[in-house]
């Protein structure tokens, strides 16, 4: 009698559900996955090596391009590592601005995730709803940094500039009538802080809309419940972090366990799952959006009442003001020197980790006393999660592989780096 053999299937890198350039070699018995072998490296850009030939400040934009959905949180890990080596104090206002933008970035990431994950599974409407809200937050990015995605807003010692007093408004055009324009600019008459406040006042209702579409949806539950189960013990052994480990019932969050900036002064909860399946990880991320709203509201309240500097007064690191530069020759020379030669960081090594929307994002920085890093190592959360894909997918159907890739929230910028 003829022997039945397993067959091999290439999933990606051109597959729309492969989240970028994932090539997954699946060994199948009928439609059941026996083995899943991820092939990475198709988006490798040598970020760690490039950083060795750039000054410390020139590498900030490279961080944006790692996980290109959670831009500012990547920058945060990098500048924290530099600040540890320099031993400089960051002004309190800058710390609150950083925390506020970390949470804005977390919401941006989770909106992209919920839209793409639902789209992969077959629910198209959520994607359109999620992008409606992302647009507002992208406008906030643009208001503070001039760029919608790659902001390069954080600086060693603080942030590039304070929150602007006026929120940019939409201009009249052929495709918009006056009524539509007035509606679009409704919340944009005040400052950037007013706009963010207005957004986070409206946002919980939007999260309710996503939950109405998904949480009790019979098809959604059939596709997610009991899929990709990871036990708490195994989650620890696999090195999972972020929503992946919290979905398995372990309340591990760097914002609580190893607080950085002002997270120890802010009141919020860590959502955890019970069963460790895709559905629990979905619920954890949805609740994280609500907690980010709480954190953002507290930051806004503090920032309204406490004006102050947003970058350190250490002039070895911080550039002079734009106004001073245009009137004072010494300031101009100082600015030129700082951006051509850069600042020198004392010899030593430091590890800084932040609670990234996807997990623990760490930067290990080694300095030999020069104006460039001697070695920069990036600890990307997605790398450990993708390593667990084989174990999570075994025994499931081929259609469930898409759900598992979606629940891991894979972005290849940080995995291949």
From Swiss-Prot:
Keywords: Cell inner membrane, Cell membrane, Membrane, NAD, Quinone, Translocase, Transport, Ubiquinone. The keyword Chaperone does not apply. One of its GO terms (molecular function) is NADH:ubiquinone reductase (non-electrogenic) activity. PROSITE patterns: COMPLEX1_49K (PS00535). Its main location: membrane. One of its GO terms (cellular component) is plasma membrane. InterPro entries: NADH_Q_OxRdtase_suD, NADH_UbQ_OxRdtase_49kDa_CS, NDH1_su_D/H, NiFe-Hase_large. It is found in: Cell inner membrane. It catalyses: a quinone + NADH + 5 H(+)(in) = a quinol + NAD(+) + 4 H(+)(out). It is a peripheral membrane protein. Its EC number is 7.1.1.-. The keyword Repressor does not apply. It holds the Pfam family Complex1_49kDa. NDH-1 shuttles electrons from NADH, via FMN and iron-sulfur (Fe-S) centers, to quinones in the respiratory chain. The immediate electron acceptor for the enzyme in this species is believed to be ubiquinone. Couples the redox reaction to proton translocation (for every two electrons transferred, four hydrogen ions are translocated across the cytoplasmic membrane), and thus conserves the redox energy in a proton gradient. Belongs to the complex I 49 kDa subunit family. PANTHER family: NADH DEHYDROGENASE [UBIQUINONE] IRON-SULFUR PROTEIN 2, MITOCHONDRIAL, NADH-UBIQUINONE OXIDOREDUCTASE 49 KDA SUBUNIT. HAMAP family: NDH1_NuoD. NDH-1 is composed of 14 different subunits. Subunits NuoB, C, D, E, F, and G constitute the peripheral sector of the complex. This is NADH-quinone oxidoreductase subunit D. It comes from Burkholderia thailandensis (strain ATCC 700388 / DSM 13276 / CCUG 48851 / CIP 106301 / E264).
């Amino acid at each position: 009698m003829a022997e039945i053999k397993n067959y091999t299937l290439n999933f990606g890198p051109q597959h729309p559900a492969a989240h970028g350039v994932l090539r997954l070699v699946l060994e199948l018995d009928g439609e059941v996955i026996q083995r899943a072998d991820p092939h990475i490296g198709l988006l490798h850009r040598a970020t760690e090596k490039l950083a060795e030939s750039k000054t410390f400040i020139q590498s900030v934009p490279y961080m944006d391009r790692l996980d290109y959905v959670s831009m500012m949180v990547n920058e945060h890990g990098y500048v924290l590592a530099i600040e540890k080596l320099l031993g400089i104090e960051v002004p309190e206002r800058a710390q609150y601005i950083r925390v506020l933008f970390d949470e804005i970035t977390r919401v941006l990431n989770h909106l992209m995730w919920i839209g793409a994950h639902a789209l992969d599974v077959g629910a198209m409407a959520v994607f359109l709803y999620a992008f409606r809200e992302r647009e507002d937050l992208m406008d906030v990015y643009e208001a503070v940094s001039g760029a919608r995605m790659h902001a390069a807003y954080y600086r060693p010692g603080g942030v590039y500039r304070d929150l602007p007093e006026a929120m940019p408004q939409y201009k009249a055009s052929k495709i918009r009538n006056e009524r539509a324009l007035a509606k679009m600019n409704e919340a944009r008459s005040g400052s950037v802080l007013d706009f963010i406040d207005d957004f986070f006042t409206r946002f919980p209702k939007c999260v309710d809309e996503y939950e109405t579409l998904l949480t009790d949806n019979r098809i959604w539950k059939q596709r997610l419940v009991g899929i990709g189960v990871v036990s708490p013990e195994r989650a620890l052994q696999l090195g999972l972090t972020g929503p992946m480990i919290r979905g398995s019932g372990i309340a591990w969050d760097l914002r609580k366990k190893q607080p950085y900036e002002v997270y120890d002064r802010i009141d919020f909860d860590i959502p955890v799952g019970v069963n460790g399946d895709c559905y629990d990880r979905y619920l954890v991320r949805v609740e994280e959006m609500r907690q980010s709203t709480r954190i953002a509201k507290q930051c806004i309240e503090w920032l309204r009442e406490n004006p102050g500097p947003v970058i350190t007064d250490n002039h070895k690191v911080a550039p002079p003001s734009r106004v001073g530069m245009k009137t004072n020759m010494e300031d101009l020379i100082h600015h030129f020197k700082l951006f051509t030669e850069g600042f020198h960081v004392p010899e030593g090594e430091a590890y800084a980790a932040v609670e990234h929307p996807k997990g623990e994002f760490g930067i290990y920085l080694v300095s030999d006393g020069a104006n460039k890093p001697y070695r920069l190592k990036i600890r990307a959360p997605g790398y450990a999660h993708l390593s667990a894909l084989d174990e999570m997918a075994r025994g499931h159907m081929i259609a469930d592989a898409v759900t598992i890739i979606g629940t891991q929230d894979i972005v290849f910028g940080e995995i291949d780096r």
